[in-house]
Regions:
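Signature for the C-terminal beta-barrel architecture of outer-membrane proteins
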Residues: 7-165, 203, 223, 239-240, ...
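Conserved C-terminal beta-signal and adjacent last beta-strands/turns
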Residues: 198, 211-212, 245-256, 261-266, ...
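C-terminal beta-signal and adjacent terminal beta-strands/loops
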Residues: 256-283
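Outer-membrane beta-barrel "beta-signal"
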Residues: 282-296
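C-terminal structural cap/anchor segments
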Residues: 149-150, 155-248
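Flexible, solvent-exposed coil segments and beta strand-coil junctions
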Residues: 1-8, 38-45, 80-84, 114-120, ...
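Active-site proximal loops enriched in glycine and acidic residues that flank catalytic Cys/His/Asp
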Residues: 78, 117-119, 155-157, 212-216, ...
Length: 296
């Protein structure tokens, strides 16, 4: 399953094998309106063919409505997740988390503009949840210029926990998002973060494209740590630790040879920020990869 921009539900193409679910989904369509409802369990990926099994320790359900017009796409959704055990910096235990949100993407004269916001509630153990996320992106396309440049400017923020004195758990959880959330490195996930980014894409020749993208990361709350893309705690944080996490730059080259075959390569660098000097020693990350894809 994949919905919207993949901030909550995606197949995780890229750094991982495709992410699947076992369960049921109902889809209804009336003109430009589509409504899906589902109740599933995430799959546990096994090494052999046709041996994946459902994760009985997690349940996932919800409904996603999309209105698709010529110049506007709007989403409204509710998502629920139940996990037998999940760990955050402040608390761990059985999790019941509910997400309500909306997303809109409009094609304007100067750019394509997207806005999304969501609120989360529920509980982990005895701690009630109160978390949020906001994101926005503008895409400027100039097809009549040489190399057909496309520039993207974006911003995202997700809540972190406010510390032991707060009466709620404020750590946002992205549920089952795209794997390459911040490129193929994705050294940190979209929890407790503020992350502006910019990108430039160029069409070098027929089927040959190049892009470069940069992100900077800060902790939204200095009382919370940093997490992986699926929401696992990577490193604890305190107000004594710096807010700045680092900056990442990634370049991507792709050649679509024909409708079936493509070749791709990427180089990326994550420069660790002051947080990794104050919390514990951290190192920069250099990453490179090349691959070929065949699609039937």
């Amino acid at each position: 399953m994949s919905y919207g921009s993949g901030r909550f539900i995606d197949v995780r193409e890229g750094p991982n094998v495709r992410f699947g679910y076992d369960g049921a989904r109902i889809m209804a369509r009336a003109g430009p309106l589509r409504v899906d409802a589902f109740a599933v369990r995430p799959q546990l990926t096994k090494p052999n063919a046709f041996d994946d099994i459902a994760d009985v320790h997690q349940g996932f359900w919800g409904s996603w409505a999309t209105l698709d017009l010529s110049a506007l796409t709007a989403d409204l959704y509710y998502l629920g997740v139940e996990r037998d055990e999940f760990r955050y910096q402040k608390v761990d235990g059985k999790e019941w988390r509910h997400t309500v949100g909306a997303r809109a993407r409009a094609k304007l004269a100067v750019a394509d503009v997207e806005l999304e916001g969501a609120y989360q509630f529920g509980n982990v153990g005895a701690s009630p949840i109160s978390a949020w996320t906001i994101a926005g992106e503008s895409v400027f396309r100039r097809a009549k210029l040489p190399l057909e440049p496309t520039m993207t400017l974006g911003f995202g923020a997700t809540s972190g926990d406010r510390g032991p004195s707060s009466g709620t758990l404020g750590t946002f959880n992205p549920l089952f998002p795209r794997g390459a959330y911040f490129g193929l490195v994705s050294a940190n996930g979209p929890e407790n973060e503020v992350s502006p980014h910019a990108a430039l894409a160029l069409a070098l020749a027929e089927g040959l494209s190049f892009s470069v993208e940069a992100w900077s990361f800060w902790r939204q709350s200095t009382s919370d740590g940093i997490y992986s893309v699926p929401g696992r705690l990577l490193r604890r944080g305190t107000p004594a630790d710096a807010r700045y996490l680092g900056t990442q730059v990634e370049a991507f080259l792709s050649w679509q040879i024909d409708r079936h075959v493509s070749l791709s390569g990427t180089l990326a660098y994550f420069a660790a920020g002051a947080f990794f000097d104050t919390s514990a020693p951290g190192k920069d990350i250099a990453y490179g990869a090349a691959w070929a894809s065949y699609k039937f």
